[in-house]
Amino acid sequence: MSDAKELKQVLTGPIVNNNPIALQVLGVCSALAVTSKLETALVMALALTAVTAFSNLFISMIRNHIPSSVRIIVQMTIIASLVIVVDQLLQAYAYQISKQLSVFVGLIITNCIVMGRAEAYAMKTPPMMSFMDGIGNGLGYGAILLAVGFVRELFGNGSLFGVQILHKISEGGWYQPNGLLLLPPSAFFLIGILIWIIRTYKPEQVEAKG
């Protein structure tokens, strides 16, 4: 029973209580770049979740056989291999989205969330818990990406997943899109607003002053 409770905590904790973007402020760079559309935000979230989960799993499985002096190199090799697999799958089955994501899929290799969970969690924890931790952190990352992507695409272009929701004036409708929301800096402010909302709801996440 305690194992099931711990597993649930590992899976759901990073979504709100210990969100990698909102609390730890990790992985922000890719969040700024890929959230102009919900479609790219979703694919990026799935890609990072897969890489984080499986890198955690594989690193945890061999953690007792990795010399401390080369552990970062081993972790990077495993993560890079998984990123290459994910990138090739995207190019094979979702080429247009792969083109839109551009270099940001490859940059998952250096994403702080993936590296951080491998070093801080997978190196010290059994495989199943490490795998679920990777999924949980991927879901936490994805939740922020989807929230930001929803606002940016809906109010920046009047659409969701490419389907027109708010009919634009240029097409005979009533809505004037806010072009600023399609620029990367808008994501920075939206993430800041989300962090403020979460920390207002959960004041224990606010850093102590002084």
Curated annotation (Swiss-Prot):
One GO BP annotation of this record: sodium ion transport
Keyword Chloroplast listed: no
GO molecular function: oxidoreductase activity, acting on NAD(P)H, quinone or similar compound as acceptor
Origin: domain of life: Bacteria
Alphabetical UniProt keywords: Cell inner membrane, Cell membrane, Ion transport, Membrane, NAD, Sodium, Sodium transport, Translocase, Transmembrane, Transmembrane helix, Transport, Ubiquinone
Membrane protein topology class: Multi-pass membrane protein
Location of this chain's protein in the cell: Cell inner membrane
Annotated HAMAP family: NqrD (MF_00428)
Similarity annotation: Belongs to the NqrDE/RnfAE family.
The protein's name in its UniProt record: Na(+)-translocating NADH-quinone reductase subunit D
Primary gene name: nqrD
